[in-house]
Amino acid sequence: MKKTVIVILSLCASVVCAQDSLRFNPIVQWDANPVESQGQTGTCWSYSTASFLESELIRMGKGTHNLSEIFIARQVYLNKADNYVRRHGKTQFGEGSLGHDLLNAVDDYGIVPNEVFNGLQTTSETHNHAELASILEAYVKAVVSNKGKKLTPLWKAGYAALLDVYLGKYPTNFDYQGVKYTPQSFAKMLNLKADHYATLTSYTHQPVYTDFILGIPDNWANGTFYNVALNDLVKQAKTALKEGFTIAWDADVSNSGFNSKEGIALVPVKGEKANFELTAPEMEVTAALRQEHFDNYTVTDDHLMHIVGLVKGVDGKEYFVVKNSWGDERGLDLYKGHVLVSEAYFKMNTISVLLHKDALLKKLKNKLNLK
């Protein structure tokens, strides 16, 4: 993937933009498709991971493609319903999922370009799944209540019909750039496979350098996470970015330090307000403090995004350039639709990072016994 050179003067000449360029200097930023909006949906996991895969395709020399986030969401909704019913309703159901769910769905169902399946069935140009989500949840709860005392296989067809109506039918074949594909053959052509990727996290309630099932509500599929030391997690993320890789990022964004309007995320010292001018110190984040915030629900699994670069702030610190899925109207003029995330914020609020196994540090890869 070629590096995107950010030329400040060519992007904007406003005073605000000039101020932004004084506060932040680019270190590296990699190609990504334009910022999109997930609308009124809980599909950040699909938007972020699809964006990540789009950058992966550019990096791998496969060209620029706009992948369908809602095609994958539709298929994952099928998997979630099956899981919910098999567990007699004793598990998470809703719109939320994680990055590995998208990758697994690509393995199982394939993937399609957005122009083939955009999931919009009305005249609206934006997604709103509020009605659909309520109906799907009511449906699976009714199935689980099992008033007929014995389930028939018909419930799956009824559930799929709801998805057909609200999102569209599964496209069995399509033409794209002059070639005929099925969703599976398109994924094969793009060489997208779940086992090419790994998800890393860092918590002290599990042994370091082992894999485990992270206990968070959206891990309904019991996905595996690799546990590493906190400093290794930060080093791995920065090194991957500097070597040409991007990262799918799961994090907490519910705290006052995350400000999408300002386009900056910080961890203010306890009792202080976040200073988005970068003129105040941040809290020192340790592994113990991170664990405490996770254990007491201060930090939860809120939102998935896509890390595409690094910048250096006027305070001398490095910030992650994070592509969001809330549209391109928020944030700094130079980074519309993005949030610049401090290292302290990353340490405190990261749930996990998903990246290509080729991006893993050799020593870390050996410790995790990954091939």
Protein language model annotation of sequence segments:
Residues 157-371:
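Active-site signature of cysteine proteases
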Residues 16-17, 56, 264, 356:
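Hydrophobic alpha-helical segments
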Residues 1-21:
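Bacterial Sec-dependent N-terminal signal peptides
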Residues 20-219, 223-231, 235-248, 327, ...:
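Active-site nucleophile-adjacent alpha helix/oxyanion-hole segment immediately C-terminal to the catalytic cysteine
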Residues 15, 59, 65, 126-127, ...:
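Alpha-helix boundary/interfacial micro-motifs
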